[in-house]
C-alpha cells in the first residue's frame, strides 16, 4: 500500500516555497517605478556621497585562502554524520572515510606547497 498522504505536508511546503518568491518578484515588478532618474543612477554608500575611489582590488591570495577554507568546511559537514554513526556503519565505511580524509590531506599539502596558505 502506498502511503503518499504522509508527504502531503512536504508537497504543500514545496509548492508554497516555490510560489512565494515568484509572487514576490512579480508583485515588485508590477509595483516598482520604471523610470530611473539621476538619483537612482548615482552612487550610494551608507547614506552619504562616496569619498574617493569606490573600487578595491583584492589579492588572489585571499581568494585561494577562502577556497581552501570552504573545502575543509565542507569536509567537516561530510565527516560529522559519519562520526556520529561510526559504531553502526562498520569497517567498510571507515575505510571510505579514511580515503576521503587522505584525499583532502593530499589537497592540503598541494595548497601548502603552492603557497595558498601564506599571508605575506
UniProtKB/Swiss-Prot annotation:
GO terms for biological process: photosynthesis, light reaction. Its main location: plastid. It is found in: Plastid, Chloroplast thylakoid membrane. The keyword Nucleotidyltransferase does not apply. The chain crosses the membrane at residues 9-29, 64-84, 88-108. InterPro entries: NAD(P)H_OxRDtase_bac/plastid, NADH_UbQ/plastoQ_OxRdtase_su3, NDAH_ubi_oxred_su3_sf. GO terms for cellular component: chloroplast thylakoid membrane; NADH dehydrogenase complex. It holds the Pfam family Oxidored_q4. NDH is composed of at least 16 different subunits, 5 of which are encoded in the nucleus. Belongs to the complex I subunit 3 family. This is NAD(P)H-quinone oxidoreductase subunit 3, chloroplastic. It comes from Solanum tuberosum (Potato). The lineage of its organism: Eukaryota, Viridiplantae, Streptophyta, Embryophyta, Tracheophyta.
